[in-house]
């Protein structure tokens, strides 16, 4: 069938094939984002001894669809003093990098849209671009509250991005590659060969930085829904408002996926007698996402100064010290522990 389509489309075949691969990744991702919102409400409801959404569909399974329809029907109100073009561009710039980063994410040895050697560098670049959507949304709203929220959010994202990047440098040193597939294969050999063990401090710093990077509780001072309402998207409504949350949840899944690939062996089985499978990867991502939800239900929100102090005075020094330690150990007879 594929050969027939290739013959029929001729020179357009590569474009059509890439579009199909993009749809095959973005479609399930949007479904995962929608049901992650339901999982969050259900999990937090369980932790607070209540039921969560349970009215739409069987046990509330259609709640994300109802929420989507509701938001599509709502009007997008643009403030009269706002810059209309930039106001609408903000949500696009927030979600586009969150989706584009998935182009280089491998689900197994062959299931990847673009298997490039600089995959890790590409993902770090894409996650950096998302901050422009935040700044533009706050500035274009022409509201002092939105602009203040945007500045705080941008400062937090940039601060923790440094610590997160340094944490991944340790993985780069151990695997000696920027290709995500090769980094996973370098962890072959079972649970004790994965990088979470020799790079444990970097794994902890990466994961907590990822929580802060995605503006999730207890680092969600930019939104602060129980205190300051909405931060940089205070003036947004309808689908424009929803796109920011789609970007947030897409980024949550992305950083959890990256943690599973970098530190937890990706699709590799934890024991030699069980086969490698994409199901292992999905299980690891789901487990990491559960921690995002657990943190939100458990920890109180940090003050802004505490968040910045943690990033600059704790995480960045810890990652630098551990990178130096890994580099020094690689010059000794114990180098095999880090490869």
UniProtKB/Swiss-Prot annotation:
PANTHER family in the record, alphabetically?
NADH DEHYDROGENASE SUBUNIT 1, NADH-UBIQUINONE OXIDOREDUCTASE CHAIN 1
Corresponding gene?
Answer: nuoH
Q: What does this protein do?
A: NDH-1 shuttles electrons from NADH, via FMN and iron-sulfur (Fe-S) centers, to quinones in the respiratory chain. The immediate electron acceptor for the enzyme in this species is believed to be ubiquinone. Couples the redox reaction to proton translocation (for every two electrons transferred, four hydrogen ions are translocated across the cytoplasmic membrane), and thus conserves the redox energy in a proton gradient. This subunit may bind ubiquinone.
| Subunit | NDH-1 is composed of 14 different subunits. Subunits NuoA, H, J, K, L, M, N constitute the membrane sector of the complex.
Q: What is the lineage of its organism?
A: Bacteria, Pseudomonadati, Pseudomonadota, Betaproteobacteria, Nitrosomonadales
Matches recorded under Pfam families = NADHdh
Give the enzyme class.
translocase
Q: Which family does it belong to?
A: Belongs to the complex I subunit 1 family.
Where is it localised? Cell inner membrane
Q: What is this protein called?
A: NADH-quinone oxidoreductase subunit H
């Amino acid at each position: 069938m594929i050969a027939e389509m290739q013959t029929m489309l001729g020179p357009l075949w590569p474009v059509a094939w890439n579009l199909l691969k993009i749809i095959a990744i973005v479609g399930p991702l949007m479904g995962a984002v929608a049901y992650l919102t339901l999982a969050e409400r259900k999990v937090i409801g369980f932790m607070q001894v209540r039921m969560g959404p349970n009215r739409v569909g069987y046990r509330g399974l259609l709640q994300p669809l109802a929420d989507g329809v509701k938001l599509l029907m709502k009007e997008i109100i643009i403030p009269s003093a706002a810059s209309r073009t930039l106001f609408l561009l903000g949500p696009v710039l927030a979600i586009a990098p969150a989706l584009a980063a998935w182009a280089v994410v491998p689900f197994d040895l062959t299931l990847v849209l673009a298997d490039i050697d600089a995959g890790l560098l590409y993902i770090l670049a894409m996650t950096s671009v998302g901050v422009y959507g935040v700044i533009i949304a706050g500035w274009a709203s022409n509201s002092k509250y939105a602009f203040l929220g945007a500045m705080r959010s941008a400062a937090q994202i940039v601060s923790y991005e440094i610590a997160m990047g340094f944490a991944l440098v340790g993985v780069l040193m151990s695997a000696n590659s920027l290709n995500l597939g090769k980094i996973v294969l370098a962890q072959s050999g079972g649970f004790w060969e994965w990088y979470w063990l020799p790079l444990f401090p970097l794994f902890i710093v990466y994961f907590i930085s990822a929580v802060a990077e995605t503006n999730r509780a207890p680092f969600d001072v930019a939104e602060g829904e129980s205190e300051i309402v909405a931060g940089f998207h205070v003036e947004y409504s309808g689908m424009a408002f929803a796109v920011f949350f789609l970007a947030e949840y897409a980024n949550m899944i992305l950083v959890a996926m990256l943690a599973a690939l970098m530190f937890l062996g990706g699709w590799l089985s934890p024991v030699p007698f069980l086969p490698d499978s994409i199901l292992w990867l999905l299980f690891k991502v789901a487990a990491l996402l559960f921690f995002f939800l657990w943190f939100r239900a458990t920890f109180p929100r940090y003050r802004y100064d505490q968040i910045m102090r943690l990033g600059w005075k704790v995480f960045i020094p810890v990652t630098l010290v551990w990178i130096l330690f890994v580099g020094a150990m690689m010059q000794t007879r114990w180098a095999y522990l880090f490869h």
